[in-house]
């Protein structure tokens, strides 16, 4: 009879205060959890990171690339690579996957590594650029027309042309520079740049050099021509002009000399 009173009191409290009964139920369930810790909800995500290495890589057309995707997920559910490039061998290890990309020819492509952990998906990205440095940079001998020199520079077998910058340098200063970003072709190309340069007296005997530069999102590839010195002797016009001036000067001197000689002879004959 003594134990019946507390039991009746418990039922009375549960009926009067429903929260007490639910709290007791939750306390009982927690006590039944393993190791005495509350059970994690099924929708809880595990914090983790995903990284790609290298994040940027540049190769010559037709070469292969190796990309490494690492993550901090203790038990990844899935790991995959999304890219328009053709994939080769795939190697896997604890916390990493290595992907091989074959025959890279597109000038710029993206590769996304996706990792799913506890129902949540994260990703990282690498950019792959294909390029071909200029095979040669050739500066033709300047041609003088009137008072201007025509400079012509040839850049051969370069890709992608849209990222090429051609610069003409005379001595220590840049006399012309052009970016070819308007060209969007996907093949190797030859580029010719023509520029007219009005040279003054101080510009002679100084070298002219043609520089070609590819700017590939962090990678810079350069090539240059052999220097060529501006000289008056390259143009027949200045030579002819100089010869005519010398001949005229000689003629004047001969005339003056002959007149002076005749005057001297006349003075002697009078004496």
Swiss-Prot record:
Domain Ig-like C2-type: 62-124, 146-217
Any one GO CC term of the record: plasma membrane
Topology in the lipid bilayer: Single-pass type I membrane protein
One function term, GO molecular function aspect: integrin binding
Gene3D superfamilies in the record: Immunoglobulins
Extracellular topology ranges: 23-240
Keywords: Blood group antigen, Cell adhesion, Cell membrane, Disulfide bond, Glycoprotein, Immunoglobulin domain, Membrane, Repeat, Secreted, Signal, Transmembrane, Transmembrane helix
Locations listed in the record: Cell membrane
PANTHER family, alphabetized: INTERCELLULAR ADHESION MOLECULE, INTERCELLULAR ADHESION MOLECULE 4
Entry protein name: Intercellular adhesion molecule 4
Organism from which the protein derives: Homo sapiens (Human)
